[in-house]
């Protein structure tokens, strides 16, 4: 199902996106969540492309760090942890047509936009059909009620805004 689709514009001079993984942000009782990050133009390093800590299990190094939406302490603690543990960071430009798919446990960041051009990206997030909203969404979950109008915590995450985008087990056709 579609959780949301966002156009993300990082304006010229806009600062970096702090380290995080999306499981904090989506109030879903599943880890079967993926985001497609689709650049609308080539993104050079100076524009602040998406960067990842690898491997995906890196989140285990930082899952005990308390998330703080209002300060840089969380970001600083993750950065320090990654340095201490020699975590590999993949930070590369995106050519037009390249898409990043990342799991909700993938630790990621994005650099500052040091150009005079807006960095524009479409980010679509999908989750497994049959998923429930967590019992206690947090402030970090943001405007989750906008994405699930009429639903309350603990209910099945299914509204007209969350269509099934593809069905499990159905034949999928790949076009090259």
Give, region by region, the residue ranges found by the protein language model.
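Short, function-defining helix-loop hinge/capping sites that tune catalysis or transport
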Residues: 28-30, 62, 111-113
């Amino acid at each position: 199902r579609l959780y949301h689709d966002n156009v993300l514009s990082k304006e010229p001079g806009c600062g970096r996106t702090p380290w995080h993984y999306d499981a904090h942000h989506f109030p879903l009782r599943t880890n079967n969540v993926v985001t497609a990050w689709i650049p609308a133009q080539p993104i050079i390093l100076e524009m602040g492309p998406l960067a990842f800590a690898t491997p995906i299990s890196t989140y285990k190094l930082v899952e005990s760090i308390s998330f703080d939406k209002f300060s840089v302490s969380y970001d600083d603690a993750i950065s320090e942890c990654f340095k201490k543990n020699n975590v590999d960071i993949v930070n590369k430009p995106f050519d037009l047509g390249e898409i990043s798919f990342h799991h909700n446990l993938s630790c990621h960041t994005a650099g500052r936009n040091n150009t005079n051009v807006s960095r524009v990206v479409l980010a679509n997030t999908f989750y497994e059909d049959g998923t429930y909203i967590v019992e206690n969404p947090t402030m970090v979950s943001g405007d989750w009620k906008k994405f699930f109008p009429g639903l309350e915590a603990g209910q099945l995450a299914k509204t007209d805004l969350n269509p099934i985008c593809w069905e499990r087990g159905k034949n999928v056709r790949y076009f090259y």
